[in-house]
Amino acid sequence: MVRALSIVFFVFVSNSFFSQVIKGRVMDENRAPIYGVKVSCRHHNAFTDFNGDFHLKRCDEDSVVFTHIEYERLAVKSEAEINVRLKAKITELDETKIIQKKLNNFEIGYLPPVRGVQIATGTNAIIQTENQQGAKSTGNPRELFAKIPGLNIWESDGAGIQMGVGGRGLSPNRAANFNMRQNGYDISADALGYPESYYTPPLEALSSIEIIRGSASLQYGTQFGGLMNFVIKEPVKDSPFEFTTRNTVGSFGYFGGFNRISGRIKRLEYQFYHQLKQGDGYRSNSAFTQHQFFGQIGYYLNEKNRLRLEYTGMHYDARQAGGLTDVMFEQDPRQSVRNRNWFRVNWNILALHYDYDISSRSTFNVRAFGMQSARYSLGFLGKINQADIGLNRELIAGNFENAGAEARFLTRYTVRLRKKTVSDLRGAFLTGVRYYQGTTRSEQGLASNDSLADYQFLNPRNLEYSSYDFPSRNFSYFLENIWFKGERLTFNTGFRFEYIHSSSQGFYKRYAIHPLSADTLGVYQVTDTTSLGRIVPLFGAGIAFKTSKLTQLYGNFCLNYRAVNFNDIRVSNPNIVIDTLIRDEYGSTTEIGYRGLIKPYLYTDLAVFHLFYGDKIGLAPEPNGTNKIRTNIGDARNVGVEAFVEMDFLKAFNDSSRFSLSAFVNFSYIHAVYIRSKEANFIGKEVEYVSPVMLRSGLKFKTKRFSTQLQFSYNEGQFSDASNALEPSGDAVIGYIPSYYVMDFSLRYEFRKWFQAEAGINNLLDASYYTRRATAYPGPGILPSDGRSFYLTLQYKFKR
């Protein structure tokens, strides 16, 4: 009896308790749970958990209110169980999200003016790599950047191991003129003295690539090219475990494997991936193996605070086929006359993010990062027209250790104006500081005389050529402000203050050689120590006017600066001589453009620009000598036109069509010349590695499951040095680079949501061409691009 009464009492109390509680679930428009939604009823509050569930004490009010910083406020009638879906908040400050949603089919677009702790105005682009078609495993840059005007591409390898891209007449060498970042932090070797990027994230791991130029790029650095930020896919939000595997086979013995796991468990989210690339290469002596690893763990402390820890690791070994002379290239571009050259890179990056949503208007972010990496080039570095007779090889070792932290604060505000006839002034203010410190050690000496990948000095304590340490420190303060006046006018300003201190300490050796017998008469060690600090203030401003809801005119101006690189001032290279008075570069960029959706099926992005490049560093024949000299050639002026247009023909006739047939044209014309120089014969000469006309176009057909694309790429001929030499030098370091065109074909079919196949042919017509003449590694000489190649990719996805 007592037991029965206890059960009745328990049931009664339970029912009474649950009758006093409102429960339910909150989801977005795609039925994904939303974490951190505030649920309110008079004085009682609750927050949704990671499954979107909530329990709220019942009150006497008739309505329950749901609020979240990223979603529209919603009030519903109070009931015992409430399940709701919230709409994403779209304000006038970030209304370009509307455009981006409409641009999903175009795989390209531009960034909202305000997002997170970032302001993006002027020329900028976002490449939606998740939706992009092409050879993702090998990272074909022609397909990746097909819709970004004005980019010149170096093709040093056919596997996407290193990226060489430059915009608006800037050098493509390892993308050194871009501030290269991943998830907002640095990935280059040394941000100050050696900003070359040996590491490129796998395209299969990316959600997008952000490119910001103009005044808004000052928040990231001083580079002429602006920012290029690789955005890794976020961990999946709606599953504790997801597994994706992509396996690719291709021509020249290529195999690529990409495996990723991801998930979220309550407040914890995670992802880990590994990528393998290996192959024999298009040319003889060009086999390679690369491993990449990435791990990310994120934890929500509460609905406003989030921590993320990331590790990136990469290792690759590549045999270097070396360069070719012009005669060799015409005979057989696949041949190699170097079989003892090797290249190795180890890359390790650790990063920590902290995000704090202070309020619906203000956000704070701190990102700290550190890197410990190394690169080794081993081989015979003599001129390519000299035979390798098997003597001791040269080894250049670079070790990079750096660390930094960047803090950003962004707040949105409204200025109430007294005059009723004048609309309020709305805006967003971003400010931040950055500290960076790094040390690069560069050593050059003799190594073994065999053909193995043996990265060891013969005399590590008495190097035959040079040994240097390059410490550097950098403090930066930056601010950006954007005003929205009325419904159409936007004005922004940016300022960056840089303090840079760089130094060098070490030695190099000079050899006295007998002019007839070539015997060594003496060796002289020269100790070299320098220290230089400088303050660099930079300014930028921009304006935009909305010609319609989905189109705008914009203009921008900003100052730029580039510090002398370590490799600019000290490397023993038999092919070039370094000017001892070489100095930093400076300049400015001005642009005017028009972009947007003219119609739902027609997107365009047009721009004209003027880039002034003062004290430009380049390669020229040495006066009264036979060598090439790296020096400040003079002042250059780059002016150009960039145009991109894409149209979906089927959508033009039927907006609700299930099929898509689109074509795009990407055209740029760049006129880059030296306008001042200490060498009179350089004035009026074209700037090296600037292709005056670049054209990329493509045709794509797409259904729900199937898509296919044909793409055409053309580059007009360009010079490789400031003297504009047409006839090649005997070592092929200097000479004209002829025009070339390439076609790429790809297709994709999705059998199910969990399985898809991709295939394609790169360089469909088997064109024989090259994009650069290398002065040293991986040459020297002509570096042929890959011929026709095939690939097949199978993707499988499992989701728990």
Segments from the language model and where they lie:
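Membrane-embedded beta-barrel scaffold of Gram-negative outer-membrane proteins
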Residues: H353-D357, T363-G379, K546, Q552-C558, ...
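Short acidic/polar hinge/loop motifs at secondary-structure boundaries
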Residues: Y185-R213
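Short strand-turn segments of transmembrane beta-barrel domains in outer membranes
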Residues: S208, S215-S217, L227-G263, H274, ...
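Conserved C-terminal beta-signal and adjacent last beta-strands/turns
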Residues: Y300, T312, G398, G555, ...
